[in-house]
Swiss-Prot record:
Biased composition annotated in UniProt, kind: Basic and acidic residues: 179-191
Further remark: Present with 3360 molecules/cell in log phase SD medium.
Sequence positions bearing Phosphoserine: S10, S12, S14, S60
Function: DNA-dependent RNA polymerases catalyze the transcription of DNA into RNA using the four ribonucleoside triphosphates as substrates. Component of RNA polymerase I (Pol I) which synthesizes ribosomal RNA precursors. Besides, RNA polymerase I has intrinsic RNA cleavage activity. The heterodimer formed by RPA34 and RPA49 stimulates transcript elongation by Pol I.
Name used for this protein in its record: DNA-directed RNA polymerase I subunit RPA34
Main location as per UniProt: nucleus
Residue ranges with Basic residues bias: 208-233
GO biological process, alphabetically ordered: nucleolar large rRNA transcription by RNA polymerase I; ribosome biogenesis; termination of RNA polymerase I transcription; transcription by RNA polymerase I; transcription elongation by RNA polymerase I; transcription initiation at RNA polymerase I promoter
Annotated signal sequence range: none
Length: 233
């Protein structure tokens, strides 16, 4: 008789599985055999309030060996020059701290293991949690913007050729005819159709009166003829 499977599938086959933080070599890299001790305590764990770990991010094209000192200001950014290139130093500690609190940080410190044959994630001595950087600085090259003579670069504005015979009938929002000096012309144009319509009404009324008069005269003539005919009979 077959057995029924479990109602759910667990994430791991065994609850006693031990997750190792041992660092594996990425593709394209070689294993380094001359690892040295990292300046933490004997277990590669940070001693509280006695040591600080700083992360300083440099551009890949900067030769760090030429750097004798690093000007740091915790209140604002600073600048320095290496090989005639200017660089800006920014304190990103607050940004990294907020990312760490939201579990969004991807920064971890790798230190040599006790055997010096592999790397592992550095942890704190208190709760064995991954070690966080006390300070994070980013170094980026600043661009030099050359001086621009705008009087030579600026191109004079050319007006669009005007077409003669056009009439302005619509105005932009916030403007009226007076702003374009066409108030009188527009008013005259508006009055003309009213005059024409009134004149047309007069012509139509006179034609109606004329037709009514003609009908009345025809009716009177017909009545007179009918009376004469009756009188003869």
């Amino acid at each position: 008789m077959s057995k029924l499977s479990k109602d759910y599938v667990s994430d791991s086959d065994s609850d006693d599985e031990v997750i190792s933080n041992e660092f594996s070599i990425p593709d394209g890299f070689k294993k380094c055999k001359h690892l040295k001790n990292f300046p933490l305590n004997g277990d590669n764990k940070k001693k509280a309030k006695q040591q600080q770990v700083w992360l300083i991010k440099f551009p890949s094209n900067v030769d760090i060996s030429k750097l004798k000192s690093l000007p740091v200001d915790f209140e604002s950014s600073t600048t320095m020059t290496i090989d005639k290139h200017d660089y800006k130093i920014m304190d990103d500690t607050d940004i990294e701290s907020s990312l760490t609190q939201d579990n969004l940080s991807n920064m971890t410190l790798l230190v040599p293991s006790e055997s010096k044959e592999s790397l592992k994630i550095a942890s704190t001595a208190k709760d064995n949690a991954p070690l966080q950087f006390d300070k994070v600085f980013s170094v980026s090259e600043t661009a030099k913007i050359p001086a621009i003579d705008y009087s030579k670069v600026r191109v004079p504005r050319k007006d669009v050729p005007k077409v003669e015979g056009l009439k302005l009938e619509h105005f932009a929002t916030g403007y009226d005819a007076e702003d374009f000096h066409v108030a009188e012309e527009v008013k005259e144009n508006k009055k003309e159709p009213k005059k024409r319509s009134h004149h047309d009404d007069e012509e139509e009324s006179s034609e109606k009166k004329k037709k009514k008069k003609e009908k009345r005269e025809k009716r009177e003539k017909k009545d007179k003829k009918d009376k004469k005919k009756k009188h003869r009979d």
